[in-house]
Swiss-Prot record:
This is Mitochondrial amidoxime reducing component 2. GO terms for cellular component: mitochondrial outer membrane; peroxisome. There is a cross-link at K138, K144, K173, K187, K287, K294 (Glycyl lysine isopeptide (Lys-Gly) (interchain with G-Cter in ubiquitin)). Signal peptide: none annotated. It catalyses: N(omega)-hydroxy-L-arginine + 2 Fe(II)-[cytochrome b5] + 2 H(+) = L-arginine + 2 Fe(III)-[cytochrome b5] + H2O. Ubiquitinated by PRKN during mitophagy, leading to its degradation and enhancement of mitophagy. Deubiquitinated by USP30.
Length: 336
């Protein structure tokens, strides 16, 4: 049955039994897999493709406020705009300057020290030397609407109030800041504005480029074999972490099924100076791990017009079919 079959039995709370009893359990497991595959094919009658398991979900992350710490979750909905757990939405909050321009860890590296928990429909924000901030996830419609700029594109956000603004201003101590929230009735940023040269069709709120980013544990482990000072998964801020595959195997995954969510590859994730911010100290290095990645993860020369000199690490995906997923779910590549 192999490791994958044994882990499936463990998730069901069943021991891996020897002899005929084991065969009976295995038969039940195979039947369940077959029924699931049949159900998937029936749900997608026009797309006759087979499923090839390429890994397993080991971690799920939602980053409510852009550049602040992520929240690890066991399960999530996957919407067209990214992961969601209750009122926690991925990159639905954004720190801005008073003129509306976004502020990220690239400009204010200490943002990565802001931790977030979720209680009673509120985000609870904590940071070194600061009292906690209780932030309601449902804002008054009378709160001001800001016209914001995210990577040169216009997008709106609703002001989270003076208390939140003062909290971030006091913590960062470099400028006057506001916090805004994206709302579902607002116009998101369109893929044809983000990547005009690519034939893609999706939208995002405040993420850099895509609703979902996937990275494998093996790719991180490979990078760390080349690093004097090891880096963490938090340096790269993926939404979905995959185990059970080889390093950089995710480069080859074009279309995925996880839980009942279907995703389609947009492009590889070009890495920037944000990866050099230490998630534990908020100190920006400006060199590593970026320099090491550049030594072996640059794009093919034919793709330089897209990626330029940025090293590639992780993959951006659009959500083709919304649904739910959880830690422990198999990751299937959908192949012809």
């Amino acid at each position: 049955m192999g490791a994958a079959g044994s882990s499936a039995l463990a998730r069901l709370g069943l021991p891996a039994l020897p002899g005929p009893r084991w065969l009976g359990v295995a038969a039940l497991g195979l039947a369940a897999v077959a029924l699931g595959a049949v159900a998937w094919r029936r749900a997608r009658p026009g797309r006759r493709r087979r499923l090839q398991q390429v890994g397993t979900v080991s971690e799920l992350w939602i980053y409510p406020i852009k550049s602040c710490k992520g929240v690890s979750v066991d399960a999530a909905e996957c919407t067209a705009l990214g992961l969601r757990s209750g009122h926690l939405r991925d990159r639905f909050w954004l720190v801005i300057k008073e003129d509306g321009h976004m502020v990220t860890g690239r400009q204010e590296p200490q943002l990565v020290l802001v931790s977030i928990t979720y209680e009673d429909d509120c985000l609870i924000l904590r940071a070194p030397g600061m009292d906690q901030l209780v932030l309601p996830t449902k804002l008054l419609s009378s709160n001001k609407l800001h016209d914001c700029r995210v990577f040169g594109l216009d997008i709106q956000g609703r002001d989270c109030g003076d208390e939140a603004a003062q909290w971030f201003t006091s913590f960062l101590k470099t400028d006057a800041f506001r916090l805004v929230q994206f709302e579902k009735n607002m116009k998101a940023r369109a893929s044809n504005e983000i990547f005009p040269s690519l034939d893609k069709n999706y939208q995002v709120a405040y993420p850099d480029c895509s609703p979902v980013m996937i990275l494998s544990e093996a790719s991180l482990a490979d990078l760390n074999t080349r690093m004097e000072k090891k880096v963490k998964i938090n340096n790269f801020r993926p939404n979905i972490v995959v185990t059970g595959c080889s390093a950089f195997e995710e480069d080859t995954w074009d279309e995925l099924l996880i839980g009942n969510v279907e995703m389609k590859k947009i492009l590889a994730c070009p890495r920037c100076i944000m990866t050099t911010v230490d998630p534990d100290t908020g100190v920006i290095d400006r060199k590593e791990p970026l320099e090491t990645l550049k030594s072996y993860r640059l794009c093919d020369p034919s793709e330089k017009s897209i990626y330029k000199s940025s090293p590639l690490f992780g993959i951006y995906y659009s959500v083709e079919k919304i649904g739910s997923l959880k830690v422990g779910d198999p990751v299937y590549q959908m192949v012809q």
